[in-house]
Amino acid sequence: MHDLQWMKTGSRWALALCHWVSSLHGSLFPHLSLCSEDMIAEFSQAVDWAGCSIRAFAWHPHTSKFAVALLDDSIRVYNTNSATVPILKHRLQRNVASMAWKPLCASILAVACQSCVLLWHLDPTSLSTRPSSGCAQVLAYPGHSPVTSLAWAPSGEMLLSASPVDTAMLVWDVSTENCVPLQWFGGGGVTYLAWSPDGSKVLAATPSAVFRVWEAQMWTCERWPTIKGRCQTGCWSPDGSRLLFTVLGESVIYSLSFSEYSGEMQGQVGGSKTASIVADLSETTFETLYGEERIGGEVHSMVWDPSGERLAALIRGNPETPESRTIVAVFRTRNSPVFELLPCGFLQGEPGAEPQLIAFHPCFKKGALLTVCWSTGRISHVPFFFVSGQFPCFSPSHSPVVALSSSSASVREQPLFSEL
């Protein structure tokens, strides 16, 4: 009888301890109290993931083909060389948060879903508009859902996946469907991944005020704490030597530079100790032809074009200011010999349309091509014609573009030249 009473008392204490630990964990990481849909909306690179008809967008890295994930959980694949538009549907394809095409491969699309990662194997020569669910490979791991971010190694050999509820990011060997968890306690999960174009490093953002950069050879990492909030977004220079990132609650762009190590120092991340502010995007009033406009605020997402010469930042408007709108700011950039970031201008949609997602075409030959997905469901492609400073003017793949004279075309018909 005494033993039974002792067991009851011990059970009550154990239950109370579990509740206390759960409460403490929830207070440290409040996102864990959110439902899956709200959690995805909180960490998505789309401005209004829950309400917009377009939830994710991904260019193929080598061809003019892109995938669009829609509100109804379907994915459409568009190709400039084909009138066929495959529509991808699967019973596990719910709440798509991110997509990524496998590099050096024509036909594999990774999709971040609520309960798993789906790998669609699409025959580029097929005329079918409804590939069967048998074309999709399922990658799932206990406790790793919802999946909010994906990143392929530039070589295509590995796939990373991240979930805000899992403190480990997973490194998948797609051929065997096996994964290795890269565990790092603290941070409360992983929300966003960005693999550097040179393949040397990976940015891993967390729901708390800290982010990590992993080097992709020995898989060691360095951590950087932020003062005000979590890392919201980030992008790499083409050579992987510089990371630009933003912090939730701040209207600035930060820069971190990285050194390249060899010999005994190989395997170290090599990041600078502190980040420097390279742009202040605080709200400012501009006089335009249409009156006074308030522009500026927090950066929700950011992309750097493959040449490293144009940067686009999606700036959220202030909800407390009616005149403030969500816009896309475009900058001219140079990474060497010294880093430069100069404003080029802004992109705004038609009345009632706000930008939701942005992406640069990975292999545009005449400068940079920015894709903008709008809240109305429209997708627009905005060209910036320039001769890349990385290539000589006579390079056949980067031939200069001749501007139209005023006598041969009106101003409205002229292409947008950000640099001649």
PLM regions: where:
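WD40-repeat beta-propeller superdomains and closely related acidic/aromatic-rich repeat-like regions
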Residues: 1-420
